[in-house]
Each structure stands twice: as structure tokens, then as C-alpha cells.
Amino acid sequence: MSATALQVKTTQKPNSRLALEVAVPAERCQANYEAAVTRLSRTINLPGFRKGKVPRAVLLQQIGLVRIRATALETLVDAVWREVLEQESIEPLCEPELSGGFDALLESFQPGEALTLILETDVTPTPKLKATKGLQAEAEVVTFDPSKVDELIEQSRKQLATLVPVESRPAAIGDIAVVSFSGTYDDDGSAIEGGSSESMDVDLEDGQMIPGFVEGIIGMSLGSEKTVDCHFPDDYSKEDARGRKASFVINLKELKTRELPDLDDAFAQQSSDKATLEELRNDLEQRLQEDAKRRDRSNRHDALLEALTEQLEVDLPNTLVQQEIRNLVEQTASQFAQQGMDVKSMFTPELVRSLMESSRPEAEERLRRSLALTALAESEDLKIEESEISAKVKEVSRELSGERDIDPARLRQAVSDDLLKDKLLDWLEDNSTITEKVLESEAKTSKPAAKSKGSKTKSTKTKTNKAKTEKPASDKTKS
């Protein structure tokens, strides 16, 4: 073994962290010290001496031993770190942390004497799965509901409706009420911030306002005044109003009703690019069916991924967790920016710290799911062929032909990741048992209604025919 060779002892620590205890020979320490002296003598400027011609004794006196030792140690630690990575075939996730700190190590560093230092770093974890086949998962079923077609058409009719004044009857559900109002809290009589208006349009539909407000307007006559009791929900957006009772003095100034357009071809042409009402209905039905299939598939895949993640054994490195947390916070900031908000003034250091803390559980769960899929791909040797990736890249590139600043390498990686994820989830679906569950609220809307009391479940073995799980769980939920 060379006199300057490094001896390394590796210790695995929690959270996928490695501690590398490195024994640096005395000759190596002395050589680094001498190199530091030479380097400083060439670069330092001292009065009365030409650059690079400063005598060693003068240099030591002017700079001091501590600075020279510190310079030597810095270069030594950096060189040792790079050499250890290559020698031990380690791929770190972050820069090394010197155990005990630099100052403590500097005190023990003496040229001509051996030195032991400990470097710590996070490394990519090795995820393992206790099982990959025969997993049990439960997924909520999503089926096409024909009544949604009528709901969408009615929404369009409302948007295209003509508002007609009402004078001869009281306010009713579905009307548009123009009101003035002022509100106070019942507990202390204080005015509600933002709780007054001289004129506001109120759509008299359930859920449009806080509980009690719309209900109080129903039955009022034009020009009348009424005090209405309301209750702010516990999850109301303004914290100081949550759960509090309030009273509003309401004046009904105007009342309007919607005059809906006839359901005919003219309506279809006005509300869409379809020529006839039949074409509009067929288009809406097709889109809703496709959406139901997508959501149903997404539910199954989410359930399978959750079941797979339960089989995962892994130590999450803090470096990856922090990276995922930053991604989540950046996504939140991007969403606010897209809504036109001033992100720079909104995202104070305090808010960022709070968001990072609250985002940690989600970040860890996302990491666990990603690592579970990675482990599945390795365990079952599932890959995507280059030809598949290239074909998909061409398809996506055509769709993004008008976009600028597209990084081909990043696009290819994103396409590859998506294709592999789909393949892994399809494999899971073929090798797992999914219990499909229809919630009571959805069962009531399925046909025939009389046969859909309570929750219904059906166990579907998706081992031989994947297409079977693309269908509703039971004929009773078909429409």
C-alpha cells in the first residue's frame, strides 16, 4: 500500500446517510502543508519582497501558522473527499459534512502527523419491496352518469339566459336578487369586515352564500327589509369569522328571473360548435364517458400505488426530502403567480418556512411512491424500449409544435418516465386484486336506484384480462 493511500471505513447511518471515516497518512498531511506554504509564497505580496520570493521564515511570521494550516487542511479535505468517492464508488446526493466541524479538525491537524477525519453525506437509498404480486387494493368506481349531460346543458342555458325583472311575486330559488345588506356578529355586535354592500347580485341557489343568507332572502318581496340569522362555517376563509353566528339586515332592491333559451338546434349553435342539439348531446356524452374512464383508471392506479407503497422498505435521505419540499413550494408559488398574485411580496420568509414544514408529509409520501415504482421496475425487470420512447416523443413534439423553449433532453426524460410509470401500473393491475367500491352517494344516482342501497363492493381479479377492469364494477351501476 502506498504511503499516501487512504484507509476508509464506511458506516451506514439512518436516513440513507453514510459516514466515511478516513485515515490520512502523515506523509500526505505533510505534503499538503508544504504545498500550501509554496502556494502562499507565490501569491502573497509583502513590502520589500518580490512576488514569489518571500522567504519561508518571513512568510510564516507574517501570515501565521494557523492560516497556513487552515489553507492546507481545506485543500486536503477537498482532495480526500474526491478521492474517497472514486475509491469507494460512492455517488453522493449532497456536499459532505465534516463531522465535528472544521475548527475542531484544524486543532488536531499537525503537519507530519496522521489525521483521521469523518465525512458524512446522503446517498441514493436502495428501496426494497416485501411483495410485488398478489397485492390487495380498494378503489372507488367512477361510472358515466347520463344525468350529467343534462346538467351541463342546463348550465349553458343559464349562462345564455335573459334576465327578466320580477315584480309580482316573492323571491324564489333560481332568481337573481339585487340586495343591499349589512352584517354584525351576534357575540359582540361588531360589524363584519367585508360584510356590507349597497348593491350586490345574489344567485338564489343553495351553497352560494354562507348558511342562512340565501334562505333568508327566499320569500322576500320587492322593496322589503328583513333581518336574517346566519352562521359562518368552521372552515370559512377568514379565520376570525369561523364558527361565529351573525345577523344581516337585507333590503331586496331588485328581483330578476332567468328566461332560458329553448332546447333546439339554435341553442346548440349558440353554446358550442355543434350544428344540432343531437350532436351537442352526443359530444357531451362522449367527453363525459372518456372522463369517467380516465378518473376510474386513475382511482385504480392510485389505490394500487398505495398498496405497493405499503410494501416498501426504504430510508428516505433528508436531501431528497428537502428537494421535494422545495418542488412543492415552488409549485404553490407558480399556481399563485398564474392567478395574478404578487408572489414576491406574498411569500415572506415566515410563509416559506411554514409551507416547507407543512409540505413535508406530502413530500415524503411522493418520494415513497416514486421509490416504490423504482423498486418494482428493478424487481420485475420492467423497461421501456427506445423505439417506444422515440415514437411518443414525436407525438408529443407535434402537439407542442407551437411551444417555445422546449428542452429535447428533458422532454425525452419526461416521456420515458411517464411511459414507464404507465407500464408499471398496468403490470400491477394485471398482478393484483382490486376491490372496487361504489360510495353510497354515487350508488343512489346509478340505475336502477332501488338496487343501490348502501355501499357495494366487488372483488375483481385483474390477472388475466386487464380490459375487464376498464368496465364498471357491476351491471347495477351501468347507465
Curated annotation (Swiss-Prot):
Function noted in UniProt: Involved in protein export. Acts as a chaperone by maintaining the newly synthesized protein in an open conformation. Functions as a peptidyl-prolyl cis-trans isomerase.
Biased composition (Basic residues): 453-466
Compartments, as annotated in UniProt: Cytoplasm
Annotated GO biological process: 'de novo' cotranslational protein folding; cell division; chaperone-mediated protein folding; protein transport; protein unfolding
Record text about domains: Consists of 3 domains; the N-terminus binds the ribosome, the middle domain has PPIase activity, while the C-terminus has intrinsic chaperone activity on its own.
Family affiliation: Belongs to the FKBP-type PPIase family. Tig subfamily.
Source species taxonomy: Bacteria, Bacillati, Cyanobacteriota, Cyanophyceae, Synechococcales
Reactions it catalyzes: [protein]-peptidylproline (omega=180) = [protein]-peptidylproline (omega=0)
PROSITE patterns: FKBP_PPIASE
Protein name: Trigger factor
Record keywords: Cell cycle, Cell division, Chaperone, Cytoplasm, Isomerase, Rotamase
This protein's GO CC annotations: cytoplasm
Region named Disordered: 437-479
Composition bias, Basic and acidic residues: 467-479
Organism this protein belongs to: Prochlorococcus marinus (strain MIT 9303)
Gene3D superfamilies, per the entry: 3.10.50.40, Trigger factor ribosome-binding domain (3.30.70.1050), Trigger factor, C-terminal domain (1.10.3120.10)
Predominant place of localization: cytoplasm
A molecular function GO annotation: ribosome binding
Domain PPIase FKBP-type residues, every copy: 174-261
Enzyme Commission number, as recorded: 5.2.1.8
Domain of life: Bacteria
Matching InterPro entries: PPIase_dom_sf, PPIase_FKBP_dom, Trig_fac, Trigger_fac_C, Trigger_fac_C_sf, Trigger_fac_ribosome-bd_bac, Trigger_fac_ribosome-bd_sf, Trigger_fact/SurA_dom_sf
